[in-house]
Amino acid sequence: GRVSVHREGFTRAMGLAGDGDRIVVASAHQLWRLENMLGPGEQANGAYDRLYVPRAAHVTGDCDVHELAIDRAGRIMFVNTRFSCLAVPSARYGFTPVWNPEFISKLAAEDRCHLNGLAMHEGVPRYVTAVGRADMVDGWRAHRMEGGLLIDVATQAVVADALSMPHSPRVLPDGSVLMLDSGHGELIRVDPVGGRRETVARLRGFGRGLALHNGFAILTLSLPRNGSFGGLHLEDMLIAAGTAPVCAVQIIDLR
């Protein structure tokens, strides 16, 4: 097999989830549902065993959706970064909030803590990441360097702190959490019981997405905005190594 890349345009696409026959994409103001149109044994253009076609879009408004998942009931659950909460689509409104960090006193379109990552376990939300413990408009920006949090959704407990711009937590089979400590330029594993963390890999770009497949971590790296990483530790690490940042998909063997 080989990697096949096909580009399709969605305005400010960030969140992505799927179950084989369905893909859900979060864009600037909508959640798009794409369905596979091929049956068993069918191929498109004699090469592809999936053909995803847009079938529905739900208007959320400007929620800055960073990540989403499909829960055990088949609902789309998404990280509503603008309103600092987890949410589901609403038939009447743009969304219905279902959870928020306990330090958020009001759900307002103010991106207070930059809630951005969601880990599901057995079809329910398990962990989230936030860039900083803040309860004011854009308050997270003062915590970019070392203020990041990994939070247990069920208990509101902080599992890990002193992270830098954390993203994309994922629960491993042993119960530990694999995630991107993006500002430090690392893929890390966190023990949710004791909080101990270990570096799995160092990254040559800003990590923004992570998936697990058959013992492999598949992650995406971004280049800096405006030519620099804004003083993050990642920038210092790359300079010290004499390495230029890359925009790439990286596959890491976890076995």
Language-model region placement:
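Blade-loop segments of beta-propeller domains
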Residues: 2-67
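Beta-rich, blade/repeat-based domains predominating
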Residues: 10-20, 58-75, 104-126, 147, ...
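Residue position within the beta-strands of beta-propeller blades
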Residues: 25, 78, 128-129, 179, ...
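A short loop-to-beta-strand structural motif that recurs across blades of beta-propeller domains
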Residues: 30, 85-87, 146-149, 186-188, ...
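Short, conserved, GDST-rich strand-edge loop motifs in beta-rich repeat architectures
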Residues: 33-42, 128-145, 220-243
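Short loop/turn segments that connect beta-strands within beta-propeller blades
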Residues: 37, 90-93, 153-155, 191-195, ...
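Surface-exposed loop and turn segments in beta-propeller and other repeat-based domains
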Residues: 41-61, 94-113, 132, 157-158
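Loop/turn-rich, solvent-exposed surfaces of beta-rich toroidal or solenoidal domains
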Residues: 165-242, 247-250
